[in-house]
């Protein structure tokens, strides 16, 4: 079963046994089943963000929590589950954090506002395959926040860089490139994310 299915089973067990998770884990703010965030359960939306045994999304590389399976753990293993830890992602309840900060960063500049022509123009502007692929690499970021959770400074610079580069590499995005980057970095700083010091933990 998947890691999130395990959490579903745990919650069902807590409800069935009438247990209060507050008594299970001192300091927990919940008085019912353990709250955790999820949506697609297919590794697309990034909502299932958890810190598992000291790693963002757990022991597997390049997967989200919902893609993690319990076969990665052994019987009797102690599994420590924590929410993302960053000033930019305040805890709402249990394992759920508020990731609206990423939306606010995108609202600051993650778009193209200049006229880019009509529908036919989209096919008339030639873009090399290499440029399109590089732009798609940035667009592949699902905004889960693992880069922030892993960074000792709580920096969102990798997220911002992915969004800026996915647009700036395309001809339509070059016009506002500098303005976009400055606005998004300023919003990131305003929201309390740390600075990048090139530790490459992300």
Can you say where each PLM-predicted feature lies in the sequence?
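Short secondary-structure capping/junction motifs at helix and strand boundaries
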Residues: 17-21, 33-35, 59-60
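S4-like RNA-binding module at protein N-termini
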Residues: 52-75
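Glycine-/proline-rich flexible loop or hinge segments
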Residues: 29-35, 48
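A short, compositionally biased
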Residues: 43-49
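Ferredoxin-type iron-sulfur electron-transfer modules in oxidoreductases and energy-metabolism complexes
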Residues: 2-29, 77-202
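Serine/threonine-rich, repeat-prone extracellular segments and beta-strand-based repeat modules
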Residues: 34-42
